[in-house]
Swiss-Prot record:
Pfam families for the chain: eRF1_1, eRF1_2, eRF1_3
Family in the record: Belongs to the eukaryotic release factor 1 family.
The protein's name: Peptide chain release factor subunit 1
GO cellular component, one term: cytoplasm
Species the sequence originates in: Thermoplasma acidophilum (strain ATCC 25905 / DSM 1728 / JCM 9062 / NBRC 15155 / AMRC-C165)
Length: 417
């Protein structure tokens, strides 16, 4: 059975891929139109605005640019006739002549209904499409603050979904403890404590400055380090109350550099199971437990093995790396209807093996979307794993970006790369 969030996963992936595609496109001149329409905007007002832009664009000096811009505006106005009102989140039109090979151009059109509401009406005509407003919608919503500290070093960072981001790493100038007795020893101890206090103040300032602008979005803050320094730092007034209130727990970790942040996340994810990184870890561990079995257990990996299992409705869980960037090309012979599927664009146009007729390209399918469709049809649970976490990197690098856990073991269970 598919979880409800699976559909959100694939929608987010499709949205991300669309922005990647748009970011690669450029025009010969300022010929690419980006039109953002909020959900509460009247279509009639948008059309009136475009008519004004059409009139203004008629004065563009360059004949080719003028022709292309006017054609793009006309195309958008024609498409708007099919809408009485904008969709619930509004929509964005990307229209214009994009550069192709040599000095050639071709008309390009893409309409996107974003995952979050468009808040501002915007019209831009430029040499590239304006994507800033949409890219903010891809920013990770699951944010945690991270601090690791001892008397020698501290590191402050964020956990954005499954990606660890270092804000700052600072070294202290606190000297080691003085072991000799006498008055000079007590004076030296006071100097040590003064230096430690200044160091903690500095770390607190870094943490406050990093976390306060995002305090409403931060789900929790994790504080870690070796020994009792973390407890002392937490109990004193180095952190603002708003930051201190977000501290979920304190953890013992062995390091206070970037590796300490990774260790802190590891410890936190073990105790807080609703974190995205915890879910991905659990999913990958389920697959790895099967892989480690002498007979491979219920685990399979490799494209063909997974496709065969999906077609036989044997897959219980399918894991796909978000970092996979492949396209499946399907060609068909116009005479005998024979088909050929390739996972990369061929250097030479394929011909039919039966009669030598040049084949026709009939489909270009995104690899992840195609696998997702097969899995959904077979009733498998699908999870798209980010390539930022250690588990995600393992899936992509060691298993080719796709892995599955079967419902039952088949006799010919062979792992294929």
């Amino acid at each position: 059975m598919l979880f409800m969030e699976d559909d959100e996963q694939i929608r987010r992936y499709e949205f991300k891929r669309a922005l990647e595609e748009l970011s690669k496109l450029h025009g010969r001149g300022t010929e690419l139109i980006s039109l953002y329409i909020p959900p509460d905007k009247q279509i009639s007002d948008v059309v009136a605005y475009l008519r004004d832009e059409y009139s203004t664009s008629s004065n563009i000096k360059s004949k080719s640019t003028r022709k292309n811009v006017l054609a793009a505006i006309e195309s958008i106005m024609a498409r708007l006739k099919y809408y009485k009102t904008p969709p619930p989140n509004g929509f964005v039109f990307f229209e214009g002549h994009i550069a192709t090979r040599g000095d050639q151009t071709e008309m390009y059109t893409k309409i996107i209904e974003p995952p979050e509401p468009i808040t501002t009406f915007m019209y831009k005509c430029d040499s590239e499409f304006h994507l800033e407003m949409l890219k903010t919608m891809l920013e990770e919503k699951e944010i945690y603050g991270l601090i690791v500290i001892d008397r020698k070093e501290a590191t402050v960072g964020f956990l954005n979904g499954t990606r660890i981001e270092v804000v700052d790493n600072v070294q202290s100038q606190v000297p080691s403890k003085h072991h000799q007795g006498g008055q000079s020893s007590r004076r030296f101890e006071r100097l040590i404590e003064i230096a430690a206090n200044e160091f903690f103040k500095k770390v607190g300032e870094i943490a406050n400055n990093a976390f306060m602008p995002k305090i409403k979005d931060i789900r929790a803050i994790f504080l870690g380090g070796p020994g009792a320094t973390k407890e002392y730092f937490f109990e004193k007034d180095y952190l603002r109350n708003e930051v201190k209130e977000k501290i979920k727990d304190l953890f013992d970790v062995g390091y206070t550099d970037e590796s300490g942040l990774r260790e802190l996340v590891e410890k936190a994810s073990e105790s807080i199971k609703d974190m995205k990184i915890s879910k991905e870890k659990d999913l990958m561990n389920r697959f790895l437990r099967e892989v480690r079995k002498p007979d491979g257990g219920l685990a399979i990996y490799g494209e063909q093995a997974i496709r065969d299992a999906l077609e036989q409705k044997m897959v219980d869980l399918l894991l796909i790396s978000e970092g996979l960037r492949k396209v499946r090309y399907t060609y068909r012979c116009p005479t005998c209807q024979a088909e050929l599927t390739l996972n990369q664009e061929p250097n030479e146009w394929p011909v039919c093996e039966k009669d030598g007729t040049p084949m026709e390209l009939v489909a270009e399918d995104d690899f992840i979307e195609d696998l997702y469709r097969l899995a959904k049809e077979s009733g498998a649970q699908v999870e798209i794993i980010s390539d930022q976490s250690e588990e995600g990197k393992l899936l992509k690098q060691a298993f080719g970006g796709m892995a599955a856990v079967l419902r039952f073991i088949r006799k010919d269970n062979v792992q294929m790369m």
